[in-house]
Structure formats: C-alpha cells, structure tokens
Amino acid sequence: MSFLDQILAAKQAEIAAARRLRPQADLERLAAKRDDFRGFAAALARPGVRIIAEIKRASPSLGDIRPDLDPADLAAAYEAGGAAALSVLTEPAFFKGSTKDLKRARAVTELPVLRKDFILDPYQVYETAAMGADAMLLIVRILDDDALASLTALAQGIGLECLVEIHDKADARRILDLAPPVVGINNRDLAHFRTDTSQAARLANRLPRGSAPVAASGIHSADDIRQALASGPRRFLIGEALVKAPNPAELLRQWTSLKVSEVGGRNPE
C-alpha cells in the first residue's frame, strides 16, 4: 500500500469518526454564519513573487520537521516577511496538523488561510468553513471528475476558494473544463513522495486560460525560485524550508524581493 493509499484510508476513518461526534448540520450552520472570508486568489494575483507560506509539523517523507512549532508565532513571522497567504496542515495522523493550528495561525494575521488536507467529502467542506479557513486544497489525483466538480461548486457556494492541485499531464487535462482560478502544480508524486522540481515548469502552460499556477514542493532556496521563474510560475507554496529557517521572515523578504522581470524567462502569465 502506497503512502497515499494509507493516508486516504486513515482519512475515511477520520471522517466517519467526525460525523459521529458532530453532525454535518451543525457545521452547515456555522459555515452559513461566515462573513469574514479573505480573498485567496486576489492575494496571489498581485504583482511579483507571491508565496503561500506553510505551517507544517511533519510529513510522511520527512518525518518530524518541527513538531513543537508555535503556529501563531510562525504565522506572524510569515506575514512580517511578506507572505501572500498561509497554508496550514490540518491532517493529524501523517502531518501532525490540527484544526487548532489553523485557528491559531489565522487569529494573529490578516492573510488568507488555505486548509491543507485530503478533502474527499462534503462534510469536510463545511468543516473547512466552520474552522475559519478561507480556501481549501482539492487534489485532482484523489477525486473522480464528479466529486471534483461537486466539491468545488459546494465550496464556492459557501464562500470558500479552492487551490486545485495537479501533478501530471493527465491531471491537467481533467481540469480544462473546470478552469479553477488557482492551480497548484505539485512537484512531488503523492504515490511515492518523489520530487521533480521541473514538473511545475512543464505543466504551467497546459493549464486552462485564466488559471494562476502555483509551484509546490521542492522549493528551498532563492536559486530554486529563480530557476522556476525562468520558465514557470511566479507563485509558490513553500513549507519545509520556511519551517526550518532560523529567521523565516527574513528568508521570505529575500525571496519576495526577487524580480520576475529580471529572470528573463517565459513566464506563463
């Protein structure tokens, strides 16, 4: 069984347990009361290098990264460094994330917050809104076409935005009609957790017209960003390097100060 299969099996069990503890109707009522959504796509649309800075305690491929991190402190540092948005892992079994991490991070900043998890069920969409997130991750690889379309529509209907994640050409073809405003291109193969940092550049020009590409995974340095800018996106989702950094705010300042026009590549926008 692959890492991804293990994660999805655990997630199905987690959803079933959550339903027993809290009916979906309760979450629907909380979601309906939300009037404080922060614009996720709008934050990424601004000029220059835009970074979604991630709060992540652990991962299946790396094990513990920084299990004792303070999500509020890290979120404040990310905002001070010029992050465009936050991404917070809420998956507990493999990434040691939690709803509490997301709530604590969002409470101390004005940045839009992406819930990073394995969303499979409408229950989780309402749960995402109820916990205070502004956007959620939808991974094309783990959803069939009907589920992808219905979860996207449900999210939009209650005010949530989506980052729709692809990994290869087949995924890219599947979202042509959906045309999501923001598309994450994961350089990491979720089945085996192998990373190929050239993947985002190869797929950026295969996206639907109007979809903003975000490169995710394997970005650790200014050189990585320069290389990506030369032929691909100017938006990045970065976690491990920032979580490990002694001064994440300063690192973000360095990265976001890079000039897209100075790279001289064929950015797909």
Describe these PLM feature segments.
Residues S2-D68:
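An N-cap/entry alpha-helix motif that binds or orients negatively charged groups
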Residues I7, A53, Y78, L86, ...:
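Conserved, mostly hydrophobic/aromatic
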Residues A10, K56-A58, E91, F118-I119, ...:
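Active-site beta-loop-alpha junctions enriched in small/polar residues
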Residues I55, S61-L163, K169-R174, A200-L203:
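N-terminal active-site wall of soluble small-molecule enzyme domains
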Residues L120-G132, H167-L178, A215, I219-I238, ...:
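Catalytic cores of alpha/beta
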Residues E127-A147, I185-F193, S231-L252:
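Glycine-rich phosphate-binding active-site loops on the catalytic face of alpha/beta enzymes
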Residues V182-D224, L229-I238:
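Catalytic-face loop-and-helix region of soluble metabolic enzyme cores
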Residues R202-R206, L229, L242-V263:
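C-terminal helical cap(s) of enzyme catalytic domains, especially alpha/beta-barrels
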